[in-house]
Amino acid sequence: MNKTAIKNFAVSARMKLIDAVKQKAYELGITETEIKEPETYEDGFRINNKFFRSYELEQRKKLIQKIEEKDYKQVIEEVSYTWFNRFIAIRFMEVNEYLPTGVRVLSSTQEGKNEPDVIGEVTNIAEDLDLNLDIVYRLQDENKTEDLFKYILIKQCNKLGEIMPMMFETIQDYTELLLPDNLLGEGSVVRNLVSMIDEEDWKEQVEIIGWLYQYYISEKKDEVFADLKKNKKITKENIPAATQLFTPKWIVKYMVENSLGRLWLESHPNEDVQQQWKYYLEEAEQEPNVQEQLEKLKNNELSPEDITVLDPCMGSGHILVYAFDVLYNIYQHAGYSEREIPQLILEKNLYGLDIDDRAAQLAYFALMMKARSYNRRIFRRPLELNVCSIQESNGIPQEAIDYFVGDSLDRDEITYLIRVFEDSKEYGSILEVLSIDFVSIEKRMIEIQEMQEVKDIFSLQYSDILLIKIPQLIKQAKIMSSKYHVVLTNPPYMGSKGMNEQLKKYCTKFFKKGKRDLFAVLMLKCFNFTKEGGYISNINQQSWMFLSSYEEIRKYFLSESTICSMIHLGSGSFEEINGEVVQSTSFVLKKQVVKNYQTPFIRLVEYNDSQEKKLSFLEKKERYIVAADLFLNVPGYQIAYWATQKMLVAFSENKVLGDLYDPRQGLATGDNDRFLRLWHEVDKVRINWGALSISDAHESKIKWFPHNKGGRFRKWYGNNEYLISFNIESYNTLAKQGNCLPSKQLYFKSGITWSRTTSNLLGVRLHNQGTIFDCEGCFLSAGNTRDDYYLMAFLNSNVAFVFLEKINPTLHFQVGDVRKIPLMTFNNLLEAKMDLITSCISISKRDWDSFETSWGFIRHPMLTHKNSSRRLSEVLDYWSVFAEQQFNQLKANEEELNRIFIEIYDLQDDLTPEVKEKDIVIRKADKERDIKSFISYAVGCMLGRYSLDQEGLVFAGGEFDESKYKTFKADTDNIIPITDDEYFEDDIVSRFIEFVRVTFSEETLEENLDFIAEALNKKANETSRQCIRRYFLKDFFKDHVKMYQKRPIYWLFDSGKNDGFKALVYMHRYDVGTVAEVRTDYLHTLQRKYEAEIARRDVLLESDASTKDKTRAKKEKEKLQKQLLECQQYDQVIAHIANQKITIDLDDGVKVNYAKFQNVELPQGEGKKPLKANLLAKI
């Protein structure tokens, strides 16, 4: 099946149909903004200069009434999909030769012929379709093929409506009026339907109907989710588009065979039947007492006609269609005749509900087509199927209710029937509906129908309500108040955040355990729909298996039912959904408790797509047999089926971490832009690194404090990057917003921490005293340093992680999950290994502090490991050896700690102590990275952030003291130009060369510059100095922005793409005169140098120099002219800003301060729009 072609057709058909239906409405004087009054005549009416017949006026009135009842857009959408459904249904029937006339309506059997066969065969089928031959002949004589086709199409739909009334309602209303024109033209929906989808894809594959529907609504679905991101809740009209997801066929087969199939085989074992169901899972070997329980539960009296199967969210009927196939097998082996089976299945076995009218139509049609595939005579009389789209009772007047009740009915029951279905499309099949006296109500319906035949005036007034609406309510109430042997579905996935208030309140009131998501609500509803001893099968989101918010639902199902089987699918099950968005599981439950039942769980999460998962299932890979009631011993009742027996024992026999310690989640500011800064952004004298408590912090009168915000995966030490504003003013504000400062008694305490969200393993590290923790940086204190270290060692082990993975196998390590890790006594065993733990911490700290983005940075590794060497290449080798040794030592330490914990927990058969290299968090030497960081350190020394005469951070606010820079002078004016040639003696390249000379030596200068250039990927035609200049000109600032997480501290003045002018300024040394100084001392100087260089090229061009020299001079002149022009234009920008004398406040952070110099509006004269320009390079 070519799903790309199917999707392309469906998506384009929706837009074409909507546009065409809108055009037809326009011709009738109806648009979204107005409804015109028609000019009426005796035999018709005219509007927009077009004449219509009198009966069309009544149709137009019904259309207007519908628009007023709903709205214009919804009615246009409904008419469009009605015709879409009819077109695809007729196409399916004609290709499979199911049309009663045997003549194709939309296409021709003759290859290459565009005109449908029905046009040429019209007189032969006139009687079958009740065609008026006078109309046919007139249209033929007038050569109106399009009109003839529309006439035949409408008659064909009406005729099909006699055998499939739910799919083809009689066309005599506004849908006929809005039937699009030009249906046979090139590019029309009908022509595209025939040409774009291969005929083979229609043959005996009724699932194509479901795919067409899903793709048809895909754009609408995208619109709904785009609105959801804008906090627009999902309305009842949009619930179908938001929640429809077509289930892969093999998963449907698993669900049906292991619920419906199992129901039959448990009491009627049959090897032949079982062999036909290749997704049926044979029962695992059970203990004798379990087998005894199972024997007692068998229902040997069950006959095929007794079985009832419900899909409460049937969509386009995919699951019910396969249930039909399985039921057919059951009937066959029970000895029924093949001719009678399809009708029995439709009328006795299958039930379906949905809130989407169009999907329900297609489900009905799919079942009829499935029945037709088994019995060619199935269309000989209308069948009443037990499927329906849930209808609302809104708007039924009291007079109609009174009339319906009459003298014979219980008014309370009819009132209940009406009331329970008010706004029912809001809730769908989750509505709790009671059984009432349907026999008496249906008897009254017959009386009213007989009165209708004698034209009772009162009943005529409410004929639509009495003869159409109330029967629909009765039908759906009967289905929804019954219980079934098998209930199976792919429920809608909709989190409570997307629900509107009405739906959210209903879910909270009636399905509290599952209120977080509609799929969980449907799990509970399916359970309610099921008979005792019956089966429930769903495919839904795996989150219910693990997340703490579904703890109650897990406990409920583990206590009240038996998991018969499960395929844990993970992501990639639905081929049309990419990434990790939908992570699924499919399962079968028995609504009866069978203690110690051994359940097969199949783990398919590691396979990438649905096809791979299917093959693994069939090859019987990744199977785990577990008694699911053991999960009741797991804290939180997680479905930890892939835990080994010893792991499950550890859960059941030990205390959990939360029994002994109290891990906490920290604060959420509610406004990070206001309260959080990266530590390098602010004035260092306004940071308090050592507060002991909240009162101590406030007494210091200092604003900024270290803040633990989680961060990427890292163990032992690190991720110290943020500060939080926590003075008294900020504290008072934070106490009232965000999450209102939870666990504040623990702020500034030492302990351990981990990131709540990560892309890897759990990484636990030190939480330094003086730090406040965030909701993303969870916190735990054991009360003393020794126990903190022990806990950190355990939580960083693969033992702790394997337990945590069973508790919650997502990338979120919530406090509640960590609380549930089983904790054995191991402190005494670790006493002798304390040196291993402290070694891990010190190695990780040394690594973290070797990079200038750490507030513990002292000196660059190229200088720390210099010893007496004067060659950078040798120093890099020393550093590389040291980093490798540290890496290997940390790896050995972690593996030894793993070995200890594996032994403590007796998991030698389940785990090995090895740690993958990718999971060791410290960095090995990297020539390019380390040389670039050496260059960054050099720039820091040039601008005064660092000094060769003093360790650590020397200046980041306060008074600048030039006496701290003796060995290598910091730039006096805080401005370092970056140019593409040596225009300034103190440009950045000259200063860097001087830095290399000072830190290493004059003798090895050229060798060291060559080594640096090599690390920067020097080009073949470059000198080392040219390579270094190119790096500063093109890449240094990009690397700086990346290193400082888009919060650069060295700001780049940048004239534009021609590199006319660039200069670096250190943010912490900026003052109101800096911009003016850049302009007068550097930009203007450079402009004069460009002018001089251009003049020099002019002299050469007028001389008798060689052609080669002149060509080069001309090229250089053109470049210089572009740079000069760019500088002149930039001068306007810099002059405008210099005059403003902008001040910055470091407390505001880089983002706010940088923006003051961007998007500057330059006046362009009266009546002209100001020109926007940037002073600084974009970040």
Swiss-Prot record:
SUPFAM superfamilies attached to this UniProt entry: S-adenosyl-L-methionine-dependent methyltransferases
Pfam family, one: Eco57I
EC top class, as a word: transferase
Keyword hit for Metal-binding: no
Key word Transferase present: yes
Record's keyword terms, sorted: Antiviral defense, Methyltransferase, S-adenosyl-L-methionine, Transferase
UniProt function note: BREX systems (bacteriophage exclusion) provide immunity against bacteriophage. Part of a type 1 BREX system. This system allows phage adsorption but prevents phage DNA replication, without degradation of the phage DNA. Methylation of bacterial DNA by this protein probably guides self/non-self discrimination. When the brxA-brxB-brxC-pglX and pglZ-brxL operons are transformed into a susceptible B.subtilis strain (BEST7003) they confer resistance to bacteriophages SPbeta, SP16, Zeta, phi3T and SP02 and partial protection to phages SP01 and SP82G (these include lytic and temperate phage).
Name of the protein in its database record: Adenine-specific methyltransferase PglX
Protein's organism: Bacillus cereus (strain H3081.97)
UniProt lineage: Bacteria, Bacillati, Bacillota, Bacilli, Bacillales
Gene name of the encoded protein: pglX
